[in-house]
């Protein structure tokens, strides 16, 4: 497996992490949260000689989906998102493109996934983990063989995603992290939607403390 990370400047003013996952044997490629800078994304895909199979969206916010339409038009791939966020792709009041000074986005998902679904990329298997909180349909992707997690805006290094936005909920995000993500192996590397990577073992003390306080 080859993993590439791009920090993409967005209209929200906060760089979004876009990830390109490439299976070397089959050349199947997955792009996670193509927020923009599509030419840069395509440049990497072309260098790898990759074939885009999936465009995976961890949630529906504009700063994660800004490059989806152009990427799909140029490289193909199925647009995948959790079913609870699928409608938000086509609703500017939920994807927030009307308030973060970017062109309005209206998208349709090719596939609406659920908790426990699996995606196969060549020899790699990814488990879908529904993690409501930042949005009602936020999801993470976990690969057990590689011990890596793409956490979107659910889990960050030292903190969690915002819960003051449409369909977000503070208790839900804490429950998602505490009861689902913190049960993953300690050595799991976490690749978030913004900021630096971390590991599950580095984040556990925060959520153990929150559990004690009965959040």
For the regions a language model picked out, list residue spans one by one:
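Short Pro/Gly-enriched beta-strand edge/turn motifs at strand-loop
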Residues: 1-5, 97-101, 122-124
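Conserved beta-strand hairpin/beta-sheet module of binuclear metal-dependent hydrolase folds
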Residues: 1-48, 140-152
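Residue-level detector of conserved, well-ordered beta-strand and adjacent loop positions
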Residues: 7, 22, 114, 120, ...
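Short, glycine/acidic-enriched loop or turn micro-motifs at the edges of active sites
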Residues: 25-26, 36, 62, 85, ...
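Short catalytic-loop micro-motif centered on adjacent basic/acidic residues
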Residues: 30-32, 54-56, 128-130
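Active-site HxH/HxHxD metal-binding segment of metal-dependent hydrolases
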Residues: 36-120, 205-209
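Metallo-beta-lactamase
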Residues: 94-98, 125-215
């Amino acid at each position: 497996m080859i993993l590439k990370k791009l920090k993409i400047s967005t209209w929200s003013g906060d760089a979004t992490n876009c990830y390109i996952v490439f299976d070397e044997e089959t050349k199947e490629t997955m792009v996670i949260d193509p927020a923009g800078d599509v030419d840069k994304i395509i440049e990497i895909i072309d260098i790898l000689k990759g074939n885009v199979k999936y465009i995976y969206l961890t949630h529906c916010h504009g700063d994660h989906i800004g490059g989806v339409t152009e990427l799909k038009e140029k490289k193909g791939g199925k647009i995948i998102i959790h079913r609870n966020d699928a409608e938000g792709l086509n609703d500017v009041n939920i994807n927030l493109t009307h308030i973060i000074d970017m062109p309005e986005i209206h998208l349709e998902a090719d596939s609406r996934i659920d908790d426990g679904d699996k995606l196969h990329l060549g020899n790699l298997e990814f488990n879908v983990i529904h993690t409501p909180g930042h949005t009602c349909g936020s999801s993470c992707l976990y690969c057990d063989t590689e011990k890596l997690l793409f956490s979107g805006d659910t889990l960050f290094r030292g903190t969690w995603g915002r819960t003051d936005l449409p369909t977000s909920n503070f208790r839900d995000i804490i429950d998602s992290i505490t009861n689902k993500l913190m049960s993953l192996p300690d050595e799991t590397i976490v690749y978030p939607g913004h900021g630096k990577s971390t590991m599950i073992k580095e984040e556990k003390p925060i959520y153990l403390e929150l559990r004690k306080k009965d959040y």
